[in-house]
């Protein structure tokens, strides 16, 4: 297998459909066109042609599109064959193409990888292709498209350019120490550095929003049996996703619902009631509940308001609170307010949010929805946003740390060499986002998560 091979793959989902597309990219794409179509189509024009087998018989007929490199998606010669979407027809056509020497099936994401390697896309744009396909909401799709069109990359490149100018100024101060003006102490470098830090903070805020849109927030509903966990899941999902009975231990396994609150994706997880298990099945369910709790972004601690007047989670169930991960955010949900007569709404107890509601009637559930949105810092009014991945957030955080350390060197010790090094490292972190500075191992991991025909 070589990166110089001509590659072919089905670009449409497997299964039956009205249209099926095969995509070919590489030096032998021209030969495929001449062999299968009998001619080379006019560049960038749709040509309706028969697709022929080796013996000249017609396998299918459809649209052929020819994109000679470098003016194509991958930067190579690209041929697209758009025929009927039957799996048998597509398989026959694929087998016919693979009889031509030098062709092979593409690896997952290899078309996008070649586009990146041929400078048709930067790495953030290439990742946005997969994110656009996987988008679970309109807002996520729009943000992914913004990233694909270069919105995220433009912000990052602006920061890199600003750091380049700043590094030039700092290096000049280091290389010409005998000048009458002390470049490190004249205030200009500090002002420029503060501007870069402010711009980076703005990008980080948008990236966190973009990460929420892409990854979603994992919220686990946990508590004792019959506290109303499944009723709350149904109320948040807007449908009867979980069976609800008065029998303790009805929920034996983990139930998952994917919902959206004003565009923010949430993974809501209902778990088995936590208690001493009465049988092996319940014990396994409780173990799985704890596994989900340990991986959660937030826990909704469900409390049956008819069983206790306590509002402090440490007082309600100290053993449960003691077992939770130290930094895991908790929201105490006092359920059955329709029975207890408690005032609906949200308050705070010892640093924990407390919400009183009725999962059965739905009263107070909207307060919980708004709380979940606000607790993750999700802004529904942010326009022109972009999607971001965890690696993007890590790179931005590391760049911010280096800039703060560089500022400390500037203000504390006037150490130009150390400041220059911190600026270089920050620039390197930012360049990792667009792929200007990226290891081959990372590229492999990124593109292997793509669809075969992308």
Curated annotation (Swiss-Prot):
| Domain of life of the source | Bacteria
Q: EC number(s) on record?
A: 3.6.-.-
Q: Which parts of the sequence bind (6S)-5-formyl-5,6,7,8-tetrahydrofolate?
A: 23, 80, 120, 454
Q: Pinpoint the TrmE-type G domain residues.
A: 216-377
* Alphabetized InterPro entries for the sequence: G_TrmE, GTP-bd, GTP-bd_TrmE_N, GTPase_MnmE, MnmE_dom2, MnmE_helical, P-loop_NTPase, Small_GTP-bd
Write out the residues that bind Mg(2+): 230, 251
Q: Output the Gene3D superfamilies linked to this UniProt entry.
A: P-loop containing nucleotide triphosphate hydrolases, Probable tRNA modification gtpase trme, domain 1, tRNA modification GTPase MnmE domain 2
Keywords from UniProt, A to Z, are:
Cytoplasm, GTP-binding, Hydrolase, Magnesium, Metal-binding, Nucleotide-binding, Potassium, tRNA processing
- Molecular function as annotated in GO: GTP binding; GTPase activity; metal ion binding
Localization in the cell: Cytoplasm
Its cofactor is: K(+)
> Per the record, GO CC terms?
cytosol
Q: Where does GTP bind?
A: 226-231, 245-251, 270-273, 335-338, 358-360
Pfam families hit by this protein: MMR_HSR1, MnmE_helical, TrmE_N
Cofactor binding description: Binds 1 potassium ion per subunit.
A GO BP term here is:
tRNA methylation
- In this chain, K(+) is annotated as bound at 226, 245, 247, 250
Question: What is the purpose of this protein?
Answer: Exhibits a very high intrinsic GTPase hydrolysis rate. Involved in the addition of a carboxymethylaminomethyl (cmnm) group at the wobble position (U34) of certain tRNAs, forming tRNA-cmnm(5)s(2)U34.
Q: How does it assemble?
A: Homodimer. Heterotetramer of two MnmE and two MnmG subunits.
Q: Which family does it belong to?
A: Belongs to the TRAFAC class TrmE-Era-EngA-EngB-Septin-like GTPase superfamily. TrmE GTPase family.
Return the protein name. tRNA modification GTPase MnmE
Q: Which organism is it from?
A: Shigella sonnei (strain Ss046)
């Amino acid at each position: 297998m070589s990166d110089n091979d001509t590659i072919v793959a089905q670009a449409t989902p497997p299964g039956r459909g009205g249209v099926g597309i095969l995509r070919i990219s590489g030096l032998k794409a021209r030969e495929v066109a001449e062999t299968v179509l009998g001619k080379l189509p006019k560049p960038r024009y749709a040509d309706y042609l028969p697709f022929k087998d080796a013996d000249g018989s017609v396998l299918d007929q459809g649209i052929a599109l020819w994109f000679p490199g470098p003016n194509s998606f991958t930067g190579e010669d690209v041929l697209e064959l758009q025929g009927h979407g039957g799996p048998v027809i597509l398989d026959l056509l694929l087998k016919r193409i693979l009889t031509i020497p030098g062709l092979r099936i593409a690896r997952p994401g290899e078309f996008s990888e070649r586009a990146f390697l041929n400078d048709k896309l930067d790495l953030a744009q290439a990742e946005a292709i997969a994110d656009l396909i996987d988008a679970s909401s309109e807002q996520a799709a729009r943000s992914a498209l913004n990233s694909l069109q270069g919105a995220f990359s433009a912000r990052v490149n602006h920061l890199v350019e600003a750091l380049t100018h700043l590094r030039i100024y700092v290096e000049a101060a280091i290389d010409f120490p005998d000048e009458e003006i002390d470049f490190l102490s004249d205030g200009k470098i500090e002002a420029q550095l503060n501007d870069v830090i402010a711009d980076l903070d703005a990008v980080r805020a948008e990236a966190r929003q973009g990460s929420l849109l892409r990854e979603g927030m994992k919220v686990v509903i946990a508590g004792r049996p019959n506290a109303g966990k499944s009723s709350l899941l149904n109320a948040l999902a807007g449908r009867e996703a979980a069976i609800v009975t008065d029998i303790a231990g009805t929920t034996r396994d983990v139930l998952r619902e994917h919902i959206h609150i004003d565009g923010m994706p949430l993974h809501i997880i209902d778990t088995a009631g936590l208690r001493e298990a009465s049988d092996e099945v319940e014990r396994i369910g409780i173990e799985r509940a704890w596994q989900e709790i340990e991986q959660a972004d937030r826990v909704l601690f469900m409390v049956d308001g008819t069983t206790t007047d306590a509002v402090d989670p440490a007082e309600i169930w100290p053993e449960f609170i003691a077992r939770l991960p130290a930094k895991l955010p908790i929201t105490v949900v006092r359920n059955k307010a329709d029975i207890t007569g408690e005032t609906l709404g949200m308050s705070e107890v010892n640093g924990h949010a407390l919400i009183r509601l009725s999962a059965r009637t739905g009263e107070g559930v909207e307060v919980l929805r708004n709380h979940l949105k606000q607790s993750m810092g999700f802004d529904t009014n942010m326009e022109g946003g972009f999607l971001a991945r965890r690696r993007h957030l890590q790179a931005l955080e590391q760049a911010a740390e280096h800039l703060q350390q560089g500022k400390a060197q500037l203000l504390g010790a006037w150490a130009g060499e150390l400041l220059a090094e911190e600026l270089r490292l920050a620039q390197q972190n930012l360049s990792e986002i667009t792929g200007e500075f990226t290891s081959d191992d990372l590229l492999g991991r990124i593109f292997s998560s793509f669809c075969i025909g992308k």
